[in-house]
Regions:
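Extended, charge-rich alpha-helical interface modules
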Residues: 2-95
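LRR N-terminal entry segment and analogous cap-like coil->beta motifs
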Residues: 65-175, 179-184, 188-189, 262-282, ...
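Leucine-rich repeat
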Residues: 89-93, 98-102, 110-119, 121-129, 137-147, 149-156, 166-175, 177-184, ...
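Concave beta-strand-loop units of leucine-rich repeat
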Residues: 104-115, 128-138, 156-165, 184-192, ...
Length: 375
């Protein structure tokens, strides 16, 4: 085994550890000139990509430092994508680099038995997205996917719009002996059985889970409420309930639940816009779980300037770095309130579809010079 092979093996064996990745970057700098083409020509760029993505992962989320590191990495990856990831094109629909190496892949459920062993053998993959065609003539059960032993190193599982509606598939997922280390789960856009969701949240399955995406499931309001208020054993740091029809009294109970008391990223995009969202009936400053909140998306609630004022009264808003206020009827007065706030220190602000003028946007840019302003 060559030194390069040994370093790569160490990365595969310790996917959470940055040290082997940084050692590999150093090795590329020192030995890249002796590699065969085309690795020789791209060795310095590969080392730089590893370091910049690790810098991104360690930086304060959404900060200018993180953005610069991400942009630098993207330029390098775009230049060398085929060279660094071409070996997976036969197996993966898409792939993404994480901390300098391919760490996220998208595969088709129908090919999982052939694809999973191949992709996990060559790269430190910890995140996987499963695609399943909706056409019934090519229907593929996901039960076999959840039996794959390769999933034991997966921490992020994404099943967006996979047409999962059968309880048996959800039970196969939660009963899988290979998903015990799962920390992030996306079930966005699936016809999730409400009874299953409530029982899952209350129950012991997937105990390491800290991030859950249930977005674009309008029917889940009562089920997610019943589950979260009884899920004191869970500790979510990221929760996406966007597009779920939730009544104000239900949302108040969710926001006060122990399960999300330490949430850092909370997405509550309202799917009933232009009708006002449930947050318009609540005191924003007091119902939101502020302790660790750094990302808050309130898209579509129609809060207006009064809602912005309620939001800004809470001192803990100083912890926010990402704020989504699209489709909230802010107008010039809402902009004035945001600009006058002495607490906010934002790196991202979404104010799309708020009837703002270029002057309003310029005022926000002046107030938040380090922020990306979407309008």
């Amino acid at each position: 085994m060559t030194d390069r092979d040994a370093l790569w093996a160490a990365i595969l064996a310790n996917p959470d550890d940055d040290l082997p990745r940084l050692v590999y970057a150093d090795w590329l700098d020192e030995n890249g000139s002796g590699l065969p083409s085309p690795d020789r020509e791209s060795a310095a760029d590969r080392a730089a990509a590893i370091r910049s993505q690790i810098e991104y992962a360690r930086a304060e989320p959404f900060s200018p430092v993180a953005r610069i590191a991400a942009e630098q990495t993207q330029r390098l990856v775009n230049t060398h994508r085929q060279e660094w990831g071409g070996h997976l094109r036969e197996f993966a629909e898409t792939f993404e680099f994480v901390r300098g190496f391919i760490g996220h892949v998208t595969i088709e459920a129908a090919r999982s038995a052939q694809v999973l062993p191949a992709v996990f053998e060559t790269d430190p993959i910890q995140a996987i997205r499963i695609l399943r065609p909706a056409a019934r003539d090519v229907w593929v059960s996901l039960e076999a996917v959840f039996e794959a032993v390769e999933l034991r190193q997966v921490t992020t599982l994404e099943l967006p719009f996979a047409d999962m509606g059968a309880t048996v598939e959800f039970e196969a997922m939660t009963d899988s002996p290979h998903l015990g280390g799962l920390t992030s789960l996306s079930l966005s856009g699936n016809p999730i059985p409400p009874e299953w969701l409530t029982e899952f949240l209350i129950g012991p399955d997937l105990p390491a889970l800290t991030a859950l995406d249930l977005s674009d499931n309008p029917h889940l309001g009562p089920a997610v409420t019943a589950g979260l208020v009884q899920a004191g054993h869970r500790h979510f740091t990221r929760l996406d309930l966007s597009g779920i029809i939730i009544r104000s009294e239900e949302l108040k109970r969710i926001l006060g639940s122990d399960a999300i008391s330490g949430v850092e990223e909370l997405c509550l995009r309202w799917g009933g816009w232009p009708n006002p969202g449930p947050l318009t009936l609540l005191d924003l400053g007091w119902v939101l779980p502020w302790d660790r909140l750094r990302l808050l998306d309130l898209d579509g609630h129609g809060l207006g300037p009064d809602g912005v004022l309620e939001l800004l009264r809470k001192p803990a808003t100083e912890n926010l770095r990402w704020l989504g206020l699209a489709r909230n009827g802010l107008g010039a007065e809402g902009v004035r309130l945001l600009a006058a706030s002495g607490r906010l220190n934002l790196y991202y602000l979404d104010v799309r579809q708020n009837s703002l003028s270029p002057r309003d946007v310029e005022r926000l840019r002046k107030r938040f010079p380090d922020a990306v302003i979407e309008w």
